[in-house]
Amino acid sequence: MKKTLIWCLAGFVIVALCCVGLSVNLHAQGDTAQQIKELQQQSRDAQMKNDASWAQQHLADGFVAGNSWGDWETKDDFIKDLQNKTNKWKSGNISEVQVATFGSNIAVSHYTFTYDAELRGTHRARTVICSDTWINDSGTWKTAATHCSMVKGK
C-alpha cells in the first residue's frame, strides 16, 4: 500500500511539473507574439517616417524584401529607399496582424497594409497582404524577409 501511494504521488508530481512547463512555454509564445505585433507596428511607423535607423537595427543580415510591384530588395536597397527624400507617405494603415511562433527564435507575422504614397516617382495607392519572417538574433528580434502582394489598387 505504501509503495502504491509513493508511485501515485510521484506520478502526480511529474504530471504537475509537465503542466507547469507547458504553461510557461505557452505564456512565452504569447509574449513573443505580442512583441512581434508591436515590432510590426513600429516597423510600419518607421517606414511612414522614412526612418532608416529603425531598419538598420531591425533588419537581419541577408534580409530580402519582395514588394508588391515585383521587385526584390536587399537590406541595403531597402534602407536606401527609406533614405530617399522623394519618397512621400500620405497614409498607411496596418491591420489584421497575426503572428505564428516556431519555437523561441522564429516567428512569422502576416497582415494587411493599406497605403497611399509616392515611391520612386510613382504614385501607389493600394492594399497589400504581407508576411514577415522574424528571427531572434541574440535577444533582438529582426526581420529576415518580407513579402507583400497586391490585393487592390494601383
Where does each model-flagged region fall?
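Secreted/extracellular small peptides and ectodomain modules produced from precursors
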Residues: 6, 16-17, 128, 146
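A beta-strand edge to alpha-helix "cap/lid" segment located at domain peripheries
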Residues: 27-57, 62-154
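Positively charged n-region of N-terminal signal peptides that target proteins for export
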Residues: 1-4
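Bacterial N-terminal signal peptides
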Residues: 9-21
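N-terminal membrane-insertion alpha helix
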Residues: 23-25
